[in-house]
Swiss-Prot record:
The lineage of its organism: Eukaryota, Metazoa, Chordata, Craniata, Vertebrata. Disulfide bonds join 22-70, 36-85, 39-123, 47-101, 51-103, 106-113. Together with the alpha chain CGA constitutes follitropin, the follicle-stimulating hormone, and provides its biological specificity to the hormone heterodimer. Binds FSHR, a G protein-coupled receptor, on target cells to activate downstream signaling pathways. Follitropin is involved in follicle development and spermatogenesis in reproductive organs. Glycans are attached at residues 26, 43. SUPFAM superfamilies: Cystine-knot cytokines. Disruption phenotype: Mice lacking Fshb are viable. Females are infertile displaying abnormal uterus and ovaries that lacked corpora lutea. The infertility is due to impaired follicle maturation which appears before antral follicle formation. Males are fertile and spermatogenesis proceeds normally. However, these mice display a reduced testes size and epididymal sperm count. The number of Sertoli cells is significantly reduced and their ability to support germ cell development is also affected. One of its GO terms (biological process) is follicle-stimulating hormone signaling pathway. It is found in: Secreted. This is Follitropin subunit beta. The keyword GTP-binding does not apply. GO terms for cellular component: cytoplasm; extracellular space; follicle-stimulating hormone complex.
Length: 130
């Protein structure tokens, strides 16, 4: 009986790790350009999920403590035309689409690594309804 309980606990721990890992997910983002004065919502894919991480009590200066986050490993770019743009302005908007995810260091050159970013649905202008 004890072996069965241990097996069940092991299974549930494995399931918790495997089923909530870093993976592609569908999201909706708001895109805008100042010349267009409108936001539109676009469906795309991005990375979401959990990565094993820890915060050490003793900070060893010789060994950096890098927290891993769920981020893209591969991405492509897609382009849409924004409606309502001024004449002679560039109405094209290019946005990233994740095609593969992994647990790795957050690259602040290409990603908002802050805890409280604006979020994917932030919009400065009114949203254009379809």
């Amino acid at each position: 009986m004890m072996k069965l309980i241990q097996l069940c606990i092991l299974f549930w721990c494995w399931r918790a790790i495997c089923c909530h890992s870093c993976e592609l997910t569908n999201i909706t983002i708001s895109v805008e350009k100042e010349e267009c004065r409108f936001c539109i919502s676009i469906n795309t894919t991005w990375c979401a999920g959990y990565c094993y991480t820890r915060d050490l009590v003793y900070k060893d200066p010789a060994r950096p403590n890098t927290q891993k986050v769920c981020t893209f490993k591969e991405l492509v770019y897609e382009t849409v035309r924004l409606p309502g743009c001024a004449r002679h302005s560039d109405s094209l908007y290019t946005y990233p689409v994740a095609t593969e995810c992994h647990c790795g260091k957050c690259d602040s050159d290409s990603t908002d690594c802050t805890v409280r970013g604006l979020g994917p649905s932030y919009c400065s202008f009114s949203e254009m309804k379809e």
